[in-house]
């Protein structure tokens, strides 16, 4: 299956012909993906509102997980 979105040939992380990540790339897009690499664990990817915790990258995924309610 697809590893990345082939729709954008300008993406340096994704091979538009095969829809696969380029060699050495961990990710192609996402709040926790920067320059084709996962952002380090603990980096805030979504600032919380109210009593919620800030959402932080896991270091293992390009997605920004919902970290949940504080308290």
UniProtKB/Swiss-Prot annotation:
Tissue: Expressed by the venom gland.
A GO molecular-function annotation: toxin activity
Subcellular location: Secreted
UniProt-listed Pfam families: Disintegrin
Coiled coil regions, renumbered to chain: none
Xref: InterPro entries: Disintegrin_CS, Disintegrin_dom, Disintegrin_dom_sf
Residue ranges constituting the Disintegrin domain according to the UniProt record: 1-71
UniProt KW keywords: Cell adhesion impairing toxin, Disulfide bond, Hemostasis impairing toxin, Platelet aggregation inhibiting toxin, Secreted, Toxin
Cystine crosslinks: 4-19, 6-14, 13-36, 27-33, 32-57, 45-64
Keyword Disulfide bond in record: yes
GO CC aspect terms: extracellular region; plasma membrane
Predominant place of localization: secreted
UniProt motif (Cell attachment site) ranges: 49-51
Other observations noted: The disintegrin belongs to the medium disintegrin subfamily.
Family that this chain belongs to: Belongs to the venom metalloproteinase (M12B) family. P-II subfamily. P-IIa sub-subfamily.
Quaternary structure note: Monomer.
Purpose of the protein: Strongly suppress platelet aggregation induced by ADP, collagen, thrombin, and epinephrine (IC(50)=17-33 nM). Also dose-dependently inhibits the adhesion of human melanoma cells to fibrinogen and fibronectin.
Name of the protein described by the UniProt record: Disintegrin ussuristatin-1
């Amino acid at each position: 299956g697809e590893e990345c979105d082939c729709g954008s040939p300008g993406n340096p992380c994704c091979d538009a012909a095969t829809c696969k990540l380029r060699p050495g790339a961990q990710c192609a897009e996402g709040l926790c993906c920067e320059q084709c690499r996962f952002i380090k664990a603990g980096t805030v990817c979504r600032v919380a509102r109210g009593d919620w915790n800030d959402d932080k990258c896991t270091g293992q995924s390009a997605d920004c997980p919902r970290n949940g309610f504080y308290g």
